[in-house]
């Protein structure tokens, strides 16, 4: 499969700017300025990773930047080195617009050192004014506390902003130029599967690729797959994938021979879809050189319903396995594959994965359960209402919560931290239930699991609104545990063959977060992504880089980090965001 090499991975550029006056001024600042750049590079190279687990590489300009000639030389170097985002650092006054990063598509931040001997803050303000005037928004980083001139430590508040900027900026740069692959078309009239090419091109810098679902059928029939891998996968499935409850009537249940054929087909579909996304050199040895290339897809969606699933096995196994961090080839980064070709949820999954390196849970925002409703149905009264997240397809098996943190608590880990034992526990706590015949006449196998409680999650969703464009909504909260008999009653009356996460958002007492019902009532679509951790602040920063306004969130205002130019659009943070995004327009338009 096609993987980035160290030479072509996105890098972070560090730009040390300096007062250009020679004969004493510049010379006295060289050491301090270079040390700032080196300290930032050291921080990022030990904390920020690509999604395959490798630490990011930083590229520092060949010299400090005192004027436009050195700024241009730095820009040339960064192009050669595949730099995708830049951080400018300085302890002193520099020549504003002569030294700034002028690339219109590159996320950019400036750290102005808070010291008294030299006016780093003054340059920061001057450079940011230039960025705003030129329409090139940049992020402002300035420490709360005054530091000594020889202090090489990075304050904690500065670290937090540097790391947040780097995570979001790396995500922006990493998805640019990649493809979203639609396998099929619109599923059951779902708006998210009406792929909006302008959104992908102008906001994300991505291209759209399309294949008919018949391409999977062609590869099944003509054996365009690696048979050795199929054999390995079937052996692995037999050992680790346990069948679950079959709720179908007897006449719609499959016998042992039919189930074996079903397993073989869904395994082949998984391998074929992965090959469609990223290619597979093995196919070239089978005289399928074109198919071996793939579609350079960093994310994909499978329509499934109903044109495929009325006749052939659904994509539940394929979607769940590809989105997980473990399969017959061992622990690996997840692939991003959306149910029902919901391209907008796929991008939410992509955002979550890029920011965390972790597998994502794709879910329907299915039901709001009030205290009264739960008590009426089960006889048990919860402390508050909660939301049922459930969907048949793309919920990664990591969502079982069978990974463990250092204290033994349930969690979801990035692939580089997942152990074989943890991965197998996810499988052990998953059952594969025959698909409900009335919905999936072609059969299939749906993952059935229950997410452990007490895990922090952020649910989020991009929606497209005519005349406005994309908006992002975010709700941080936690998974919860219900008494087993309560879970059984609620789950069985919904769909016991699908994966369930019981979710409670963090409430603020106002607006969309007045209560749990309000969160459900304000959700903009039928699907959401559940990303492990409270990552709303990172999502807000990422959205601002792409000029996607955030319409709903419960993130503390002190954690909101957007370009400094946003401050020119009023004092109300949400309205400010809308006005700034509208003014500057999509990043790649």
UniProtKB/Swiss-Prot annotation:
Signal peptide: none annotated. It catalyses: L-fucose = L-fuculose. Its EC number is 5.3.1.25. Coiled coil: none annotated. It is found in: Cytoplasm. Converts the aldose L-fucose into the corresponding ketose L-fuculose. It is an enzyme of class 5 (isomerase). It comes from the Bacteria. This is L-fucose isomerase. One of its GO terms (molecular function) is L-fucose isomerase activity. Mn(2+) binds at residues 340, 364, 527. The active site is at residues 340, 364. GO terms for biological process: D-arabinose catabolic process; L-fucose catabolic process. Belongs to the L-fucose isomerase family. Keywords: Carbohydrate metabolism, Cytoplasm, Fucose metabolism, Isomerase, Manganese, Metal-binding. InterPro entries: Fuc/Ara_isomerase_C, Fuc_iso_dom3_sf, Fuc_isomerase_C, Fucose_iso_dom1_sf, Fucose_iso_N1, Fucose_isomerase, Fucose_isomerase_dom2_sf, Fucose_isomerase_N/cen_sf. The keyword Cytoplasm applies.
């Amino acid at each position: 499969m096609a993987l980035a090499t160290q030479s072509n991975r996105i890098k972070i550029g560090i730009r040390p700017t300096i007062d250009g006056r020679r004969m004493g001024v510049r010379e006295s600042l060289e050491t301090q300025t270079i040390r700032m750049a080196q300290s930032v590079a050291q921080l990022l190279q030990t904390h920020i990773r690509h999604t395959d687990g490798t630490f990011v590489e930083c590229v520092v300009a060949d010299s400090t930047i005192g004027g436009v000639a050195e700024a241009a030389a730095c820009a040339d170097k960064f192009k050669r080195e595949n730099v995708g985002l830049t951080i400018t650092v300085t302890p002193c006054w520099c020549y504003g617009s002569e030294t700034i990063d002028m690339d219109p598509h590159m996320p950019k931040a400036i750290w102005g050192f808070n010291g008294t001997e030299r006016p780093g803050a003054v340059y920061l303000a001057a450079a940011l004014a230039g960025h705003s005037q030129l329409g090139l928004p940049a992020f402002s980083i300035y420490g709360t506390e005054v530091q000594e001139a020889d202090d090489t430590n990075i304050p904690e508040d500065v670290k937090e902003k540097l790391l947040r900027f780097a995570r979001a900026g790396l995500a922006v740069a990493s998805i640019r130029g990649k493809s979203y692959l639609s396998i099929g078309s619109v599923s059951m009239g779902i708006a998210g599967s009406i792929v909006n090419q302008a959104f992908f091109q102008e906001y994300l810098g991505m291209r759209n690729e399309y294949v008919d679902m018949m391409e999977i059928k062609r590869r099944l029939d003509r054996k365009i797959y690696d048979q050795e891998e199929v054999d390995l996968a079937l052996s692995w499935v037999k050992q680790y994938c346990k069948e679950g409850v079959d709720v179908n009537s007897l006449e719609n249940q499959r016998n042992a021979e039919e189930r074996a054929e079903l397993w073989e087909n869904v395994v082949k579909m998984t391998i074929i879809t992965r090959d469609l996304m990223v290619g597979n050199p093995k196919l070239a040895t089978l005289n399928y050189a074109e198919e071996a290339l793939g579609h350079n897809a960093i994310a994909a969606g499978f329509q499934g319903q109903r044109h495929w699933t009325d006749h052939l096995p659904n994509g539940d196994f394929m979607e769940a396995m590809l989105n997980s961090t473990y399969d017959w080839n061992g622990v690996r980064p997840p692939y991003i594959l959306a149910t029902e070709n919901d391209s907008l949820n796929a991008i939410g999954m992509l955002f979550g994965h890029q920011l965390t390196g972790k597998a994502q849970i794709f879910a329907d925002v299915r039901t709001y359960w009030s205290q009264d409703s739960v008590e009426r149905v089960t006889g048990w009264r919860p402390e508050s209402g909660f939301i049922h997240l459930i969907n048949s397809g793309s919920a990664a098996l990591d969502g079982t919560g069978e990974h463990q943190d250092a204290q033994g608590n349930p969690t979801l880990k990035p692939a580089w931290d997942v152990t074989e034992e943890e991965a197998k526990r996810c499988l052990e706590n998953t059952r594969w239930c025959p698909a409900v015949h009335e919905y999936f006449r072609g059969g299939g196998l749906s993952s059935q699991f229950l997410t452990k409680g007490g895990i922090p999650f952020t649910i989020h969703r991009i929606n497209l609104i005519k005349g406005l464009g994309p908006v992002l909504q975010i709700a941080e909260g936690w998974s919860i545990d219900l008494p087993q008999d309560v879970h059984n009653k609620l789950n069985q009356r919904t769909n016991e063959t699908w994966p369930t996460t019981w979710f409670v958002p963090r409430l603020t007492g106002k607006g969309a977060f007045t209560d749990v019902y309000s969160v459900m009532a304000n959700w903009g679509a039928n699907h959401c992504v559940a990303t492990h951790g409270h990552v709303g602040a990172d999502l807000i920063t990422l959205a601002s880089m792409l000029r996607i306004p955030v319409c709903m969130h419960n993130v503390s205002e002190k954690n909101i980090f957007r370009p400094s130019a946003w401050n020119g659009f009023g004092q109300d943070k949400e309205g400010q965001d809308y006005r700034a995004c509208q003014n500057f327009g999509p990043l790649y338009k």
